[in-house]
Amino acid sequence: MKHSVHFGAGNIGRGFIGEILFKNDFHIDFVDVNNQIIHALNEKGKYEIEIAQKGQSRIEVTNVAGINSKEHPEQVIEAIQKTDIITTAIGPNILPFIAELLAKGIEARRVAGNTQALDVMACENMIGGSQFLYQEVKKYLSPEGLTFADNYIGFPNAAVDRIVPTQSHEDSLFVMVEPFNEWVVETKRLKNPDLRLEDVHYEEDLEPFIERKLFSVNSGHATSAYIGAHYGAKTILEALQNPNIKSRIESVLAEIRSLLIAKWNFDKKELENYHKVIIERFENPFIVDEVSRVARTPIRKLGYNERFIRPIRELKELSLSYKNLLKTVGYAFDYRDVNDEESIRLGELLAKQSVKDVVIQVTGLDDQELIEQIVEYI
């Protein structure tokens, strides 16, 4: 049986990446700092995934174990030394925190003379996640380790897409997920191209697919949340049941389509259908996806290269409409949740500084015209 190391034993790790690895006949070592989850994985050695659709079928994932990276980093290093693949689903902000441990694992492979090619895939909601992780890992590698990594360790970028809502169950390992899933890996950075995962797509140039996903699903999902919150919706489904909100989301996706077609020459009809499927996914009655989950961390989501500001910048450069995206940015700046640190911090910034200064600080923009346009909607 092949061996995998997966960083992040949360719902996405278990409910998406774990399912794919299991179906490809991998033993999975989940690496996390959540003792409850790690203990349950080691005690049971398996968990269940429920597919949120009519009939609600279940999948039992077996051959799993857990390692607490805080308490037993040496076990993680040992696992990396012998593994066939490494994946992550921990969130973009957490990637730097696993870099040193990954570097130690790579050094252990070098010392052991393990020259089997290994790919590390960051399955995160970000553009260039694996390469970002590699830049962090390189900081901790010796000169010999760097040479070894360049020869034998690949960091191919990946695009992943599956809605896994916040949930709580008596069984801490049980997880409910939507039926749809998409995992795309770029081939040009693979070090082990012979290891192909079933139910994973491989593309030479990943960038069009990452942008299609991030600018469509992530932008559309966040739009649903911020506009939904403005109108008092508690769940994404509730937001979509409001015709006014649904129409606004469709208008945002129309602007995204114009960008993707102009930039990557996507087929218009295929893209329209892709966006239609996205709306249907948001409307899944078997999933309770809280607005608070999707809207959280607004400062990060309003970043220069994130799901709103980047497409707005590029649409402006192409002289294409971005009015509906601007309106959504206004709702994002207005979003408040007492349980979300970033939304509270955003409110504090707006109370202490001018709106324009906050827009510049949060978005990183220096285009004065665009800054003024955003200010108008806050």
Curated annotation (Swiss-Prot):
Q: What's an example GO cellular component term for this entry?
A: cytosol
SUPFAM superfamilies recorded = 6-phosphogluconate dehydrogenase C-terminal domain-like, NAD(P)-binding Rossmann-fold domains
Q: Name one Pfam family in it.
A: Mannitol_dh_C
This entry's Enzyme Commission designation comes to 1.1.1.17
Q: What family does this belong to?
A: Belongs to the mannitol dehydrogenase family.
- Species in which this protein is naturally found: Streptococcus pneumoniae (strain JJA)
GO terms under biological process: mannitol catabolic process
Keywords from UniProt, A to Z, are: NAD, Oxidoreductase
Species lineage, top-down? Bacteria, Bacillati, Bacillota, Bacilli, Lactobacillales
Return the broad EC class. Answer: oxidoreductase
Q: Which GO terms describe its molecular function?
A: mannitol-1-phosphate 5-dehydrogenase activity
**Name the record gives this protein:** Mannitol-1-phosphate 5-dehydrogenase
Q: List the disulfide bonds.
A: none
UniProt-annotated binding residues for NAD(+): 4-15
Q: Which domain of life is it from?
A: Bacteria
